[in-house]
Amino acid sequence: MNTLKLCLILYACLVLLPVRVMSADLSPASSERQPIYIEADHIDGHYQQEIEAIGNVRMRRGDQTLTADRVKYYQSNENVEVEGNAQLERPDDILWGSYLQMNLNDNTGQLSEPRYLQKDGNGRGDGNLLLLEGENQYRFKKARYTTCPEDDHDWYILADDLEIDKEKKVGTARHASVRFKDVPILYVPWMNFSFGNERKTGFLSPIMGNTSRSGVEVSVPFYWNIAPNYDATITPRLMSRRGVMLNNEFRYIGQTLNGRFLLDYLPNDLETDTTRYGMQLNHFHNLGAGWFGMINYNSASDRNYFRDLGNNILFTSQTNLLQQGFASYFRELGRNGTLTFSTLLQQFQTLQDPRAPIISPFKILPRFTLNAAKRNVYGLDFDFSGSFTHFSHSTLPHGLRTTFLPGVSLPLENSFGFIRPRVSLHHTRYDLNEPANPAANDKHLSRTVPIFSFDSGIVLERDTTLARENFVQTIEPRVFYTYIPYRDQQLLPNFDSAEMDFSYPQLFLERRFSGEDRINDANEITLAVSSRLIHSATGNERLRFSAGQRIRFSDRRVILTSPQVTRAGSDFIAELSGGITQNIKTDTGIQLNQNNFLIEKIRTGISYRPAPGKVINAGYRFTRDVLEQVDLSTQWPFLKKWQGFAAINYSLKDDKLLAGLLGLEYNACCWSLRFVTSHFTTATQRTSTNIFVQLELNDLMRIGTNPVRVLQQTIPGYMRTDL
């Protein structure tokens, strides 16, 4: 009898305390089983057989916790049966249901009336039945899935079968429809999606749109995750007015190289009855041992390709498509020296407008360039630049050009100022296939020009306070003198020289022409001053004002074909850039011809950006006898969830709209709707109107044509606010 009482007391202690049992091995290398802890209002069972817990049951094993009204645990096979308010919580998700059967060893079983929530995201779902198919593998029957918050079903996927692979963070739905506001907007027999932004092979959401040139468009991209370091996107593009085009993008990256290849191919344009294509290759390669290589190749089937079929507004304004290969070598020459060697192959595809034909640029086949510099050689700085170029052209005189430009300077510098006198000698030789000028009889020409410059400046500083902020204000006067004797160059060809835009930095350059074919004569001095406001705490430059005047002591005699100022006199330029306040920034410049006191150029822009997603831009550009344009653009929220977009580029000189954009965006908590229409003039002076409509279902898909790139290109400072 005493033995029986003792057994009953021990059994009572057993059922009143949490039970600790051993589970199956977690891994082949483990000889111990992970323990299980059970807490409940009442626990009953048989040792090594089964345990039943009733009332506020909490069962824990490792990082997995199960709560319910009633739980049966079968120790022999590690099965559990759960009834009433079942909840299974893991580190990355939570499952709810009415009835759960599950094997703790292999994580298989089923859950009735399941609900599902991802902890690391907004994904959630429910269904009629959930099958647990192993570690991190779920399969829902008659399922619904969304990323909207609880009690919000603005959009969802309704699927007969929904698989969720938590390890790969991929969902796969079969016989699925996407519903928006309970209206079916898309049906697919099969689809997969990522809820962790991982790359995966499969079809992406369809793209739909409408343009005045192509008509109604529908594209279905297929993403191919070939390897961790390269992938491809293949997109059939159906256009009601053009036919079916195939868009292809291939990307790759390695330890020493990266690049992207695009090929868009339309075998038969229904409008033109021709084959049309566009191609772009960008490749960058660190070859090692100081060598670097690059390829930039662009091509189109015809001059109207980008107007009719392009989806990048920047390309529509291009006349010459760059096609070049480049390689360079760099090494150091001791402590204060550098050596750079490079070679270049370059040509352009010119998209001619028959109404305004232009001369195609010369081909460079090839160019070899050598640059070397050695600093502080007995106080002197030596430098050398040389090149050998073969120019080619189908209609113009062409040939070889060789240049040498050695130079030496004496830099005298300290903490508050500098003086830099410099002397160089520019020598050029031409070997042409025919004389460049009818007045010349010689195909072998040369030119040698000495160049002298003297640069000097000082930096003065003082502490100041503006709007209760501490700044360092600088005053930096600068004097720059250049002397280049005149050399008659009318008989020389002009392969690549053009006059550089006049700006404040250009005041301190010896030469005013780019390229090597024209060396300007000069006897002029620049008097300039700049002032900067530098934030004392951060060291950031807040505002800069610069003004300078170039005074010419003699007439300019070397000119290009375009009208240019040749008389002695002076040019005045002033620029203001930086932040007027924390939220208002400006970039303004003005050029004044003091010979006739006329404004030659004005460039002014102001931007107001008080917060992300709030921006107002205004700009004005004027070049005498060339252009006068106004630019206005904005991105601004209104009401609670709406944003508006607008942009305009208008030519006052031609009384013509060059580009315009108008759009709206609605941002809900789990979806966004964008509508944008744009109108622009192409490089061939044709106009094009595009309409972008996109519905974005967060973390699932985008349906329609994405206007974000157009907004970024058109509205400086544009920022997405729905991320």
UniProtKB/Swiss-Prot annotation:
**Which InterPro entries does the entry mention?**
LipoPS_assembly_LptD, LptD, LptD_C, OstA-like_N
Annotated signal peptide? 1-23
Q: Name one GO biological process term.
A: lipopolysaccharide transport
Where found? Cell outer membrane
Note the Gene3D superfamilies from the entry. Answer: Lipopolysaccharide (LPS) transport protein A like domain
Where does the source fall among the domains of life? Bacteria
What keywords are assigned to this protein? Cell outer membrane, Membrane, Signal
**Gene Ontology CC:** cell outer membrane; transporter complex
| Similarity section | Belongs to the LptD family.
Known PANTHER family for this protein? LPS-ASSEMBLY PROTEIN, LPS-ASSEMBLY PROTEIN LPTD
Its biological purpose: Together with LptE, is involved in the assembly of lipopolysaccharide (LPS) at the surface of the outer membrane.
Subunit structure as annotated in this protein's UniProt entry: Component of the lipopolysaccharide transport and assembly complex. Interacts with LptE and LptA.
Name of the protein described by the UniProt record? LPS-assembly protein LptD
